């Protein structure tokens, strides 16, 4: 009875007032939850209370750090990680993220950017037993603090296990809490502050390049600074500053005179070392400390040595209109400044580039300056500019170019100017890159030049991408600008005012150039050393600033020695990467007008070998709108430019294989080199020179291709192929003779179709690549050629059903000529040879199974039809 009564009471209708009360409570709860997630920037920050105790402070008075129990650190084993930086950015276009990447790129450190995950997947951090990253950088440290529990534990375990550190930035905004604790850390943040007078903690263990002796007087940029405070001994100040106002910071337990703006976490709290910045990289000292932080947290694996080599070129000596040239006092100041700079840079010597034609073409006072300069000839280094300051790419005749150089050399000999420095610079860097062959030959003929420099390789901007290369025996070094140009001759008239020049020198672009490059060749001009002598002002103040704020050791070397040093540091840069000169307006302006990019091919047949590429080459050549390359005396119809030593002959050599285009827009050049397909170098090289090219590859059963290559080698009496059976070749083990392994590789490796196509897809869009079925090309060529024409977008479609005929004697399709005759490929094509033995076919079917499966996935991803042979192979493996 009582149970029944309770049940009835429970089932009674709920009063409306109670329902409304419950709804109101739920609404309030939802508002709080929405606010929590809407203002997610506050997550990870907890309001600071009064529980912070007053610690003892050393002089100078700074934010506190009290010794607490230490957690033992796992020794860092940097050999277990790859030298790669993982950078978590807010977006691909965020300013701070781009600045972080710019410093890494300038330092030539490898990196990978990822959008910082909130609840998304963390990138794969390990590969087997190796860590994939040596350092983690967060553009917004709150993205790290607020990681979901799974990813946070994953990342922290990785950092502890592999000794990987974290760099993070905290950028306050108008909604930031003025004082808060970083969630999960014994660290307090005080935000939206205006600061001044930044100093460096000399006891900071991460300092390497940074010299801690000075105070950067004045206001720090912005009013949104964050300072750090902690009682834990794991936190060590790196940079400190004062507040602009005399008022104390609310909630700060100690009235500290200096506040920490960059803090180093020694890893005593949780075993992970970190460096946290209380602002972005707009402040120049942050850039310097960031470089040191990268070095420290990677055990100096990602670090440049302290040595910096500097060479200052002065172009246009004797060139310049009246009023812009050096007078006697200017020449004396040049020499005196050189001697002054030698106290900081041993044997520092200005490098003077002269054009003899303009000697004594100034005012009387300037002509006296010319004479005094020549009286100091042994005090400076010298290099030839052009006699008449003409741009070399305008000279199409090498002998005329050589005559100009000979005049400059004659002038040098007459005035005692050294002629054996081995270095030259072309006016406006013309002819250096893009390469003007006549310039390189004339330089070697007249001057014996071994080194030059340019600001144009691979492009002028961004400057951090400039590189060196070697061509035709001449080493080409990257050249840097320094904020001075021919028209910047007066301090007060500097663009943007004198403050802009000082900003470039003192922590700005010029300072960063030296900081991030082990070797810097600076371009200046004669006019920068007359009048207000901005050249002298700039480099005196630059050296002073570097010596004040850094531990860098400034050195210099003559150009040839400097070039050898450069390629000793960067040997991978010796090989050039030729680019399309018409893709960069500056390049086109200093490229011979007799040359045209229309001479480049628009289609490449890349192979692989023994799949029908020569047949396709013949069929394409039948089309009236398509023109193939001229044959090579060494490699017949193939140029083989992008995959081997021919590449170093330059693009002029490459273009000579193609006709000079007519005025019609229908000219369509193509080339076929079947060994491009599996070349590791070719895809990148092709993409650089021919970024819009169409790519065709032909695939047959890789087992048949391997067997065909073996038979091809036997037909050419290859001793290894004659000695070993096909079965012995493809099954040879690691201990087999080297020449046998080489033949095995040429048989098997090109058949890794998916691997090679993916390499091409790293540089070309899928719609630029056409994969043809080699079996159909052999049996139904007319239909295949319809597909090819659509892919190429030719306007005058050709009906190959009417122009191809099957030749029963040859066993394949040939060109149909007038009178019913046919034109077929040579005797070397379509050879008959014994069928492959069953054991070899079985071995190869198993060998290529996974490769073929990956190929099917890749072709599906590319939107391409699976070849008939591939469908058959996949069905047989089920």
From Swiss-Prot:
It is found in: Golgi apparatus membrane; Golgi apparatus, trans-Golgi network membrane. Residues 1-169 are annotated as: Sufficient for localization to Golgi membrane. Keywords: Disulfide bond, Glycoprotein, Golgi apparatus, Hydrolase, Membrane, Multifunctional enzyme, Signal-anchor, Transferase, Transmembrane, Transmembrane helix. Adenosine 3',5'-bisphosphate binds at residues 610-614, 708, 813, 829-833. InterPro entries: Heparan_SO4_deacetylase_dom, HSNSD_N, NST/OST, P-loop_NTPase, Sulfotransferase_dom. Disulfide bonds join 814-824. Residues 39-878 are lumenal. Residues 47-71 are annotated as: Disordered. It is a single-pass type II membrane protein. Residues 1-17 are cytoplasmic. Belongs to the sulfotransferase 1 family. NDST subfamily. This is Bifunctional heparan sulfate N-deacetylase/N-sulfotransferase 1. The gene is ndst1.
């Amino acid at each position: 009875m009582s149970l029944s009564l309770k049940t009835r009471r429970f089932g009674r209708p709920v009063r409306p007032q109670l329902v409304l009360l419950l709804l109101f409570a739920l609404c309030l709860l939802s508002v709080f939850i929405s606010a929590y997630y809407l203002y997610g920037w506050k997550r990870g920050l907890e309001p600071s209370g009064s529980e912070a105790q007053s610690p003892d402070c050393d002089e100078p008075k700074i934010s506190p750090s009290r010794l607490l129990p230490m957690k033992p650190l796992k020794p860092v084993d940097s050999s277990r990680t790859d030298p790669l930086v993982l950078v978590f950015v807010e977006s691909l276009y965020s300013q701070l993220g781009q600045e972080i990447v710019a410093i890494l790129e300038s330092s030539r450190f490898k990196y990978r950017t990822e959008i910082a995950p909130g609840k998304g997947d963390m990138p794969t951090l390990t590969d087997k037993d190796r860590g994939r990253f040596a350092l983690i950088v967060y553009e917004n440290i709150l993205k790290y603090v607020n990681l979901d529990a799974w990813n946070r534990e994953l990342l922290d375990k990785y950092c502890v296990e592999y000794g990987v550190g974290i760099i993070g930035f905290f950028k306050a905004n108008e909604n930031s809490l003025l004082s808060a604790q970083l969630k999960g850390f014994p660290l307090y943040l005080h935000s939206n502050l205006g600061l001044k007078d930044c100093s460096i903690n000399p006891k900071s263990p991460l300092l390497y390049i940074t010299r801690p002796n000075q105070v950067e007087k004045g206001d720090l940029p912005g009013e949104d600074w964050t300072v750090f405070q902690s009682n834990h001994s794991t936190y060590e100040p790196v940079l400190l500053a004062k507040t602009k106002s005399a008022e104390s910071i609310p909630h700060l337990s100690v009235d500290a005179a200096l506040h920490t703006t960059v803090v180093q976490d020694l890893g005593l709290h949780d075993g992970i070392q970190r460096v946290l910045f209380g602002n972005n990289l707009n402040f120049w000292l942050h850039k310097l400390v960031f470089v040191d932080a990268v070095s420290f947290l990677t055990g100096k694996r990602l670090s440049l040595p302290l040595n910096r080599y500097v060479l200052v070129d002065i172009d246009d000596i004797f060139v310049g209109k009246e009023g812009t040239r050096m007078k006697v006092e200017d020449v004396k100041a040049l020499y005196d400044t050189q001697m002054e700079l030698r106290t900081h840079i041993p044997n520092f010597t200005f490098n003077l580039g002269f054009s003899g034609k303009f000697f004594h073409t100034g005012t009387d006072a300037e002509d006296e300056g010319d004479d005094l300069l020549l009286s100091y000839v042994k005090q400076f280094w010298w290099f030839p500019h052009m006699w008449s300051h003409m741009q070399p790419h305008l000279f199409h005749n090498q002998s005329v170019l050589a005559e100009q150089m000979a005049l400059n050399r004659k002038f040098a000999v007459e005035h005692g100017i050294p002629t054996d420095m081995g270095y030259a610079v072309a006016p406006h860097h013309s002819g250096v890159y893009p390469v003007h062959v006549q310039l390189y030959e004339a330089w070697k003929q007249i001057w014996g030049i071994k080194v030059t420099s340019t600001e144009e390789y691979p492009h002028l901007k961004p400057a951090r991408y400039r590189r060196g290369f070697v061509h035709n025996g001449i080493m080409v070094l990257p050249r840097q600008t320094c904020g001075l140009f021919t028209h910047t001759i007066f301090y007060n008239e500097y663009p943007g005012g004198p403050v802009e020049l000082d900003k470039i020198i003192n922590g700005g672009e010029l300072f960063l150039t030296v900081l991030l490059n082990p070797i810097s060749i600076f371009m200046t001009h004669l006019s920068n050393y007359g009048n207000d002598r901005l050249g002298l002002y700039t480099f005196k103040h630059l050296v002073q600033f570097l010596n004040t704020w850094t531990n860098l050791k400034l050195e210099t070397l003559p150009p040839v020695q400097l070039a050898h040093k450069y390629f000793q540091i960067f040997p991978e840069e010796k090989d050039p990467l030729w680019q399309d000169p018409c893709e960069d307006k500056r390049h086109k302006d200093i490229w011979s007008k007799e040359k045209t990019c229309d001479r480049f091919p628009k289609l490449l047949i890349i192979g692989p070998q023994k799949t029908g590429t020569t047949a396709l080459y013949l069929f394409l050549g039948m089309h009236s709108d398509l023109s193939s390359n001229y044959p090579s005396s060494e490699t017949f119809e193939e140029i083989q430019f992008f995959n081997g030593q021919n590449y170093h002959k330059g693009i002029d050599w490459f273009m000579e294989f193609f006709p000079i285009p007519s005025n019609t827009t229908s000219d369509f050049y193509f080339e076929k080199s079947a060994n491009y397909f599996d070349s590791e170098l070719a895809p990148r090289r092709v993409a650089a020179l021919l970024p819009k090219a169409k790519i065709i590859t032909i695939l047959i059963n890789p087992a048949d291709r391997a067997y065909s290559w073996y038979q091809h080698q036997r037909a050419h009496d290859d001793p290894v192929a004659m000695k070993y059976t096909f079965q012995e070749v493809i099954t040879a083990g690691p201990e087999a003779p080297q020449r046998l392994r080489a033949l095995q590789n040429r048989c098997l490796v090109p058949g890794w179709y998916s691997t090679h196509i993916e390499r091409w897809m790293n540089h070309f869009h899928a719609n630029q690549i056409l994969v043809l079925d080699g079996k159909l090309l052999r049996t139904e060529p007319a239909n295949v050629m319809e597909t090819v024409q659509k892919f190429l977008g030719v306007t005058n479609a050709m009906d190959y059903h009417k122009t191809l005929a099957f030749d029963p004697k040859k066993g394949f399709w040939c060109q149909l000529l007038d009178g019913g005759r046919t034109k077929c490929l040579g005797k070397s094509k379509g050879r008959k040879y014994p069928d492959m033995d069953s054991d070899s076919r079985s071995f190869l079917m198993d060998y290529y199974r996974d490769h073929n499966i990956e190929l099917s996935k890749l072709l599906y991803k590319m939107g391409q039809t699976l070849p008939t042979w591939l469908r058959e192979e996949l069905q047989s493996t089920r």
